Amino acid sequence: MRHYEITLIVHPDQSAQVGTMMEKYKEIITTGGGKIHRKEDWGRKHLAYPIKKIYKAHYLMMNIECDQEVLDKLNYNFRFNDAILRNLIISEDGVITTPSIMMANKDKEKGRS
């Protein structure tokens, strides 16, 4: 099985459904024999440029290990989910479990408050 990093940009009006959306994708991955090594919710962030006249969006990121069939099923679900504005799937060399830079920055900001 290969390792992938998936980043999702979700419509801000659908932020309340992010939890159920992630559970659905987790179920697809685990029933296909895959594993989720890291799952992060970056929250609402400003977009670098507007997408469909939207200036903020909810960001999600996960590192998974799965085969091509599961990845195709996930990609199909991402494509036909209107709540997902953009998705990015990157192939990784190995397992990544350390917090991302975004989460490290978020933790630093919480520490200052």
Curated annotation (Swiss-Prot):
UniProt protein name: Small ribosomal subunit protein bS6
Keywords: Ribonucleoprotein, Ribosomal protein, RNA-binding, rRNA-binding
InterPro entries the UniProt entry points to: Ribosomal_bS6, Ribosomal_bS6_CS, Ribosomal_bS6_sf, Ribosomal_S6_plastid/chlpt, Transl_elong_EF1B/ribsomal_bS6
Signal peptide: none
Gene that this sequence comes from: rpsF
Transmembrane in keyword set: no
Primary role: Binds together with bS18 to 16S ribosomal RNA.
Source organism of this protein record: Ruthia magnifica subsp. Calyptogena magnifica
Gene Ontology CC terms, in alphabetical order: cytosolic small ribosomal subunit
One of the GO biological process terms: translation
Superkingdom classification of source: Bacteria
Family: Belongs to the bacterial ribosomal protein bS6 family.
HAMAP family to which the protein is assigned, alphabetical: Ribosomal_bS6
Coiled coil (residue ranges): none
Database matches in Gene3D superfamilies: 3.30.70.60
Listed GO MF terms: small ribosomal subunit rRNA binding; structural constituent of ribosome
Keyword Repressor among record annotations: no
